[in-house]
Amino acid sequence: MNTFDLLIDHLFFECRYHPWTVRNALDFFVESYSYKDQCSISFTHDMGSHYVFTPKGQSSYEIPYLTDCFSYMTQEQLCNWILAAAVYAYRTGNTVWLRSRKETLVECFQSMQKRDGLIPDGIMDVDSSRCEGGSEITTYDSLDVSLGQARRNSYIAMKCFASYLALGSMFEQLPMEEYQEQADSAADNCEEHMLAYFDRKKKRFPALFDGEGTMAIVPVIEGIIYPVFFGKPEAVSEDGKHGRLIRALKEHIQTVLVPGICLFEDGGFKLSETSDNSWISKIFLCQYIIEKVLHMNMPQVMDKADAAHWSWWMEE
């Protein structure tokens, strides 16, 4: 129930039509479904299942000692709370609520920094102690390591970048100038190190920033949707402060959206070069980002992809 992975995907619709549901979920996560590990605060994957709430601070999904499906999503759920809070606060103008969550925002920022590890490059290095020797996963847990592993993952790194921008935006509204400067600096640091992993020869980002996971993924772009919806579209503009990163992402998409890499034979999106598992909601989100945030005009790719995705739905 109230799976955070779904809340973040439904966020844009909910904030437009009934934003109070987002606020209630954010509050309930803080009050009953947050927890602290060796780093600091994070949030559970869900609040229970089959109409039964789980005990406080526990989900129905996450289990220790694992390295893939059913492990913890500590870093990603932390990002999800930050991003959802930023979008809700901006879309509603509810600064009263934002002020009531000042302490939570500071805790979230400190938690983000500690998960960065001993070498602060803005990219997640620390698996939660709740994993008990296992390792964290992402919402893409049913794919292979290219998207399933959270640590040093380019998809998670971009989400962390967006989360630092979100924290900077909320600290600016409060105002909390010192924290705003620190969050903005953390976003800059994250961008700089992500760009260092961009392969100039292959013209793409690797899935994992670990020197080994060189396969390509499409959702590396997913994080840049959020600044558009929390009032900082210039942060993800090709002509803005982070223009180098945006241009690199455009080059990445141009490179990987070809058959044999991140397109199936029928032209449908293949979220990972090395996994045949895809799902349509994430594909639609990436298509929107390509067309409306990156402003890429790719009619031949998109028209064929739309036809393929339609055929997937219509298959019996």
Write out the residue ranges for each language-model feature:
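Aromatic-rich carbohydrate-recognition surfaces in CAZymes
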Residues: 1-126, 133-136, 152-167
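Well-ordered alpha-helical scaffold segments within catalytic/enzyme domains
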Residues: 8-20, 80-97, 111, 159-177, ...
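Non-catalytic carbohydrate-binding regions of carbohydrate-active enzymes
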Residues: 111-121, 128-140, 174-218, 233-316
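Short beta-alpha connecting loops at secondary-structure transitions
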Residues: 66, 141-150
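Extended aliphatic helical segments
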Residues: 22, 30, 41, 52, ...
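Intrinsically disordered, low-complexity regions of eukaryotic proteins
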Residues: 7, 129, 143-146
